[in-house]
């Protein structure tokens, strides 16, 4: 009785090894794909931004990576659609950042309602 069990254990171990190898391969392919996309994005940004503007974007990325990612995507989309002149200077990037900041500002109002607690 124990012989079939050990055989099944060996099959199970082999199956687990194969699954782990497949998962590792999938993760490696995904990592390569992301690296390639990031490289393409950096290449596009080198074309559409002046060195000073790229430096400002890099500084933003250090402090607010999610915001910088969104900004990069927006800049690329604007440049590819022809809605913004290329290359974008540091001053133009500052103006874009100010516009985004104004759009994102929200007025918070606190209303205090008096209730009679009995």
UniProtKB/Swiss-Prot annotation:
InterPro entries given in the database record: DNA_bind_arc (IPR022889), PDCD5-like (IPR002836), PDCD5-like_sf (IPR036883)
GO cellular component: cytosol
MF GO annotations: DNA binding
DNA-binding among keywords: yes
Cited Gene3D superfamilies: PDCD5-like
Record-annotated membrane-spanning stretches: none
Keyword Cytoplasm belongs to the record: no
Superkingdom of source: Archaea
Keywords: DNA-binding
Pfam annotation, one family: dsDNA_bind
Family as reported in the entry's similarity comment: Belongs to the PDCD5 family.
HAMAP family for this protein: dsDNA_bind
Protein name per Swiss-Prot or TrEMBL: DNA-binding protein YN1551_1057
Species whose genome carries this gene: Saccharolobus islandicus (strain Y.N.15.51 / Yellowstone #2)
């Amino acid at each position: 009785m124990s012989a079939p069990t050990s055989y099944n254990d060996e099959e199970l171990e082999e199956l687990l090894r194969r699954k782990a190898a497949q998962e590792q391969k999938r993760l490696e392919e995904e990592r390569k794909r992301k690296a390639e996309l990031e490289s393409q994005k950096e290449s596009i940004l080198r074309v559409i931004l002046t060195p000073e503007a790229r430096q400002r974007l890099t500084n933003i990325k250090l402090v607010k990576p999610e915001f910088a990612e969104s900004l990069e995507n927006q800049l690329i989309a604007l440049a590819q659609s022809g809605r913004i002149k290329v290359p974008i200077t540091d001053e133009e990037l500052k103006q874009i950042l100010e516009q985004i900041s104004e759009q994102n500002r929200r007025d918070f109002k606190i209303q205090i309602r008096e209730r009679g607690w009995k």
